[in-house]
Amino acid sequence: MVEKKTIKLDDVAELAGVSKTTVSRVLNNRGYLSDKTIKKVHDAMDKLNYRPNVIARQLFKQKTNLVALVFPTVDNPFFAELEAELEKRFDQLGYRVLMGNSQNNPAKEQDYLKLLLNHQVDGLIVGSHNQGISEYQKKTRPIVSIERFVGKQIPVVSSDNYQGGLLAVQRLLNDGCKHIIHTNYPINLVSPNELRQQAYEDLMNRHHRKPITYSVSFDVSDEEKERVFRKMFREHPEVDGIFADNDTNASLIIRVGKEFNRHVPDDLKVVGYDGANITRTLSPELTTIQQPIPEMATKAVELLLQLIDGKTDVKSVTLPVKMINSTTA
């Protein structure tokens, strides 16, 4: 039995009538080459049925086809769906994905970043509140952030949080609400969520209403959040509309409201934020502002790949939101 010959780079070069270096440059897209030369090399590869060694090419290009995702938690439906969408898109492009959930703990997040960077990832997509972490300032790898500001030179993919805030509050005003409260993260966190609160305050002031915001920490238990919401109902029994910072908190508010004999939509109207698929499935009655999670994932991957390819003029992107009308407002 005749052993099948292994086709090498030299064979492609000989058939194409070019040097081995030229074939290597075509494979790795390095340096200027004429279209005629590139076609000759590809024609030779096709004729010889030559398949490049992918691992060797990655080493030559100093790429691992490995990316990392760092988010606060997958317990939140928004981040759970976002991570799933990102992983799906990277898988389609031949990238492996490492994931770390920081629980919004700066020390844990820094440990994750060091670990992931030691794995020689090509780039990272993050969704962190922790702006002061040194790895973000050093920026030794391409980084794209989603819905969070982590560094001046790091592009952010976000939804139009200001417009989302306006839509939510205007809906409550249109429903006849006179006393509208907003729940949000603590104001010391640098996040596009601040734009939702700004929109709430601007619209309330425009209508000569007093804006009231209750801060709810991101990383506390549901029981602790419910304690905050009970305090809110006790301190403001007149509340008739609530713009919640996310759908999970909106659902908790509705549950706590029942303890105070406040039922949606008759005694209380609630608008959430995020509109993740799992929330729409489990709580279809929730009126909410839907973020375009699949589109945000697509854009984040696109920007990261541009950075990995060496582009330096990658800009932040803001995507539109929409109102999902249901029965809680």
Please place each PLM-identified region on the residue numbering.
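Flexible loop/hinge segments that line or gate small-molecule binding clefts
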Residues: 127-167, 187, 248, 274-286
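Short, solvent-exposed amphipathic alpha-helices that sit
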Residues: 40, 78-92, 164-167, 191-210, ...
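Periplasmic-binding protein-like
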Residues: 113, 121-127, 181-184, 236-246, ...
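Hydrophobic alpha-helical segments within soluble ligand-binding/sensing domains
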Residues: 157-182, 222-230, 250, 291-309
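Amphipathic helical "hinge" segments at domain boundaries
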Residues: 48-115, 119-120, 198-201
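Flexible loop/turn connectors
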Residues: 230-329
